[in-house]
Amino acid sequence: MQDLAGKKIIIKSPAKINLHLEVIGKREDGFHELAMIMQNIDLFDYLEFQINNEGLIKLESDCTDLSLSSDNLIVKSANLLRKKLNIDCGANIFLRKNIPIGAGLAGGSSNAAATLIGLNKLWDLNVDQKTLFSLASTLGSDIPFFINGGIQLCFGRGEILEKLDSNFDYGVILLKNPNVSVSTAETYSKYSNRFCYQYLTNGEMIENIRNNLRDNGLNNLNFDKQHLTIKNDLQLVVENDNDSVKEALYLLSKLENCLTFSMSGSGPTCFAIFKDIETAKKELNANSKLFEDKGYDAWVCTFFEKGITFI
């Protein structure tokens, strides 16, 4: 391996929203069978990677609410890559956090994918994409999506990916109460307790749902033409149990130029979609005081056509 002293890499790690989230059943491995459309947005964390000569993974961040120890997905990703390749390379990693934690925007999953990609380049490993996908899948269900990102169909527990070709340029307003976070595991457990009677076990029926999303998923995202409702099965649970999510959805639904609205992932972040970023910015400017008075953080962004990207 060549001398890499002083080498530094900076990566943009994007958030995602769910444009479709359907819980189909329960798998033998304990995970849920899902049919989803995931879309990256241009709300980014930034990760800086630099070689250290101590053979250690050292993580620092500007976010004081984040664990920086071995249970952090960034550290887990780095250690898994080292174990897989039987190497003892070290790295100093700094995370500049913009994506809210526990928000349904998959910031942690995105950071994990960024770590695999960033260290692969930093350490000059030349690990192929198939291996990166395999490692990502080991770490978490959402993580493989971020390797290529953009907009994708996601099946299985989220690791079976099919790229969609779209040129959507919608604007997005995100709304989240900073004092509220939601456990993904608890949300799925609650959903299972309430709706497991609807679960499918027949493979052919599951494949029919996948095919329907393949055939119609992209067409159903023309919100400006059809004003379609976004399906998120988990919203049924979170909205019922969390008044702030219910209120956020109501506030977004009343925005004058809102095309559609939903909760992202397991929440609690909610979002509204507008025909373009300019319209979204105008709506946020007009309603920023209302959101602030009611205790919500708000962001405006747009769809992002890529996943992890180098700066």
From Swiss-Prot:
It catalyses: 4-CDP-2-C-methyl-D-erythritol + ATP = 4-CDP-2-C-methyl-D-erythritol 2-phosphate + ADP + H(+). GO terms for molecular function: 4-(cytidine 5'-diphospho)-2-C-methyl-D-erythritol kinase activity; ATP binding. Keywords: ATP-binding, Isoprene biosynthesis, Kinase, Nucleotide-binding, Transferase. Pathway: Isoprenoid biosynthesis; isopentenyl diphosphate biosynthesis via DXP pathway; isopentenyl diphosphate from 1-deoxy-D-xylulose 5-phosphate: step 3/6. InterPro entries: GHMP_kinase_C_dom, GHMP_kinase_C_sf, GHMP_kinase_N_dom, IspE, Ribosomal_Su5_D2-typ_SF, Ribsml_uS5_D2-typ_fold_subgr. Its EC number is 2.7.1.148. One of its GO terms (biological process) is terpenoid biosynthetic process. ATP binds at P100, I101, G102, A103, G104, L105, A106, G107, G108, S109, S110. It is an enzyme of class 2 (transferase). The active site is at K16, D142. Catalyzes the phosphorylation of the position 2 hydroxy group of 4-diphosphocytidyl-2C-methyl-D-erythritol. Belongs to the GHMP kinase family. IspE subfamily. This is 4-diphosphocytidyl-2-C-methyl-D-erythritol kinase. The lineage of its organism: Bacteria, Bacillati, Cyanobacteriota, Cyanophyceae, Synechococcales.
